[in-house]
């Protein structure tokens, strides 16, 4: 039993640990984040020991009182750490002995290893972060995108491919596109949650529990869906961390592209949007500058999260079966990933909820050449094969350019009919941006009805 000078594993050692090795080995500076999960796991585990007859009712009550006292200290930031507190498990067990006495506290770890203890803590911690932090923050982001899309449904803007103006779309269609990405992230996170919510507790160091503890009882008490059926896998599996961090990298890839679009849209060259002061910074030299640092950081921090994942994968890839100390390197990148993702969600929500849209600039950026596909579709409706109409429309664009005209709508009917005799007076009805977007009314399109349908569908998926 640790008393602040002894280690949990110190019985077979006679020499002192090198001071640098102690610091190198210690994880309490970061794994303290799991204090609540560690205490919760110990509370249920000791109930399992009592069920086996290894603890009396009185001992269990005393242990639970002590655990509650420790949680109060952590919650109030009054827990006193000792130099030899190697990790959160050591610290909590040491403190429990101080509160209720070492004799009773010394029974808490009966049949349990830190190998199954730490991964139990990790799974509880990840589950709580997903449920209490990531789900609400991500839903909040999608809700803001949907609300904005509904309120600004009538604003038109250029849609881009290759960062070149392509076809007119609704601003709400762009908003809906990222609401769709983030809703898929939301659903994907739910699938990961189902897989990570399995209990390793009771697997021991690697070979199983020596006293036949009821692992299903432990799992139920901790809110897990099931137990992991192989004790070797139970203590060594970190796939749930890899999956969660991969999810974080995928979300950050989406948020990075989202940020890049908005960075472009808020430049003076585009002027489609203006960020609020709350999410902008200035220059230390140039007084006129208003920089989109919030968006640039969203883009930049995506690389940080990618690095968290790849770094841990490199630590994990070559280790032998069951537990190895390399696995201690799972926590810092995991915690960093989860915190960065959460903060990115909140920043993105703040940005999109407070920015100002310049409707006039968006609509002024629409040009008639963006209706060249509509011109091709005009002939398709007259029975001309699309491949032929595509060529004809391209010839119309080239003719207007060669004549120095500002757009294909400036060609006369006579000039159109020189290119193809099937053009008629009604072709000029094609040159209307509102009608262009309204023709895209199939599911997923940019017509008002299609966008509203997308938004309603997204709401139902989140609910």
UniProtKB/Swiss-Prot annotation:
The EC number(s) this enzyme carries: 4.3.2.1
Catalytic machinery residues: 162 (proton acceptor), 283 (proton donor)
Catalytic activity: 2-(N(omega)-L-arginino)succinate = fumarate + L-arginine
Pathway: Amino-acid biosynthesis; L-arginine biosynthesis; L-arginine from L-ornithine and carbamoyl phosphate: step 3/3
InterPro entries on file: Arg_succ_lyase_C, Argininosuccinate_lyase, Fumarase/histidase_N, Fumarate_lyase_CS, Fumarate_lyase_fam, Fumarate_lyase_N, L-Aspartase-like
Residues that, per the record, bind 2-(N(omega)-L-arginino)succinate: 27, 115, 161, 291, 323, 328, 331
Site label Increases basicity of active site His, positions: 296
Keywords for the protein's UniProt record, in alphabetical order: Amino-acid biosynthesis, Arginine biosynthesis, Lyase
An example molecular function term from Gene Ontology annotations: argininosuccinate lyase activity
GO terms of biological process kind: arginine biosynthetic process via ornithine; L-arginine biosynthetic process
Assembly behavior: Homotetramer.
Recorded family membership: Belongs to the lyase 1 family. Argininosuccinate lyase subfamily.
NCBIfam families: argH (TIGR00838)
Protein name listed in UniProt: Argininosuccinate lyase
Source organism of this protein record: Saccharomyces paradoxus (Yeast)
């Amino acid at each position: 039993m640790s008393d602040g000078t002894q280690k949990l594993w110190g019985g077979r050692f006679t020499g002192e640990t090198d001071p640098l090795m102690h610091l190198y080995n210690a994880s309490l500076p970061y794994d303290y984040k799991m204090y609540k999960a560690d205490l919760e796991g110990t509370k249920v585990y000791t109930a399992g020991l009592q069920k086996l007859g290894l603890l009396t009712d009185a001992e269990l009550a005393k242990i639970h009182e002590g655990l509650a006292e420790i949680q109060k200290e952590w919650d109030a930031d009054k827990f006193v750490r000792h130099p030899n507190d190697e990790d959160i498990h050591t610290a909590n067990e040491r403190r429990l002995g101080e509160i209720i006495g070492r004799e009773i506290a010394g029974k808490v770890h009966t049949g349990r290893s830190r190998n199954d203890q730490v991964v139990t803590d990790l799974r509880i911690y990840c589950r709580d972060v997903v449920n209490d932090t990531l789900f609400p923050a991500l839903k909040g982001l999608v809700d803001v995108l949907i609300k904005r899309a509904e309120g600004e449904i009538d604003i038109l803007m250029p849609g881009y491919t290759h960062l070149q103006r392509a076809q007119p779309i609704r601003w709400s269609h762009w908003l809906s596109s990222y609401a769709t990405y983030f809703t898929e992230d939301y659903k994907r996170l739910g699938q990961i949650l189902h897989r990570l919510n399995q209990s390793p507790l009771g697997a021991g160091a690697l070979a199983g529990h020596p006293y036949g503890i009821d692992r299903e009882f432990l799992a139920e008490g901790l809110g897990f869906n099931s137990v992991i059926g192989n004790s070797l896998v139970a203590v060594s599996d970190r796939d749930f961390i890899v999956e969660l961090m991969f999810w974080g990298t995928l979300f950050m890839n989406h948020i990075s592209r989202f940020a890049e679009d908005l960075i472009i849209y808020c430049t003076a060259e585009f002027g489609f949007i203006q960020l609020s002061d709350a999410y902008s910074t200035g220059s230390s030299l140039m007084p006129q500058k208003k920089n989109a640092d919030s968006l640039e950081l969203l883009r930049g921090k995506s690389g940080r999260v990618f690095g968290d994942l790849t770094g841990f994968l490199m630590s994990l890839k070559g280790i032998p079966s069951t537990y190895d100390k390399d696995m201690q390197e799972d926590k810092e990148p995991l915690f960093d990933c989860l915190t960065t993702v959460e903060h990115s969600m909140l920043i993105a929500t703040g940005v999109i909820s407070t920015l100002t849209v310049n409707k006039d600039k968006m609509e002024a950026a629409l040009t008639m050449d963006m209706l060249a596909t509509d011109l091709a579709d005009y002939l398709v409706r007259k029975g001309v094969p699309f491949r032929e109409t595509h060529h004809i429309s391209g010839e119309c664009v080239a003719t207007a350019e060669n004549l120095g005209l500002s757009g294909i709508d400036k060609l006369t009917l006579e000039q159109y009919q020189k290119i193809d005799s099937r053009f008629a007076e009604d072709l000029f009805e094609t040159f209307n941006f509102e009608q262009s977007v309204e023709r895209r009314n199939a599911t997923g399109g940019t017509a008002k009805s299609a966008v509203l349908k997308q938004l309603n569908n997204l709401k139902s998926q989140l609910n």
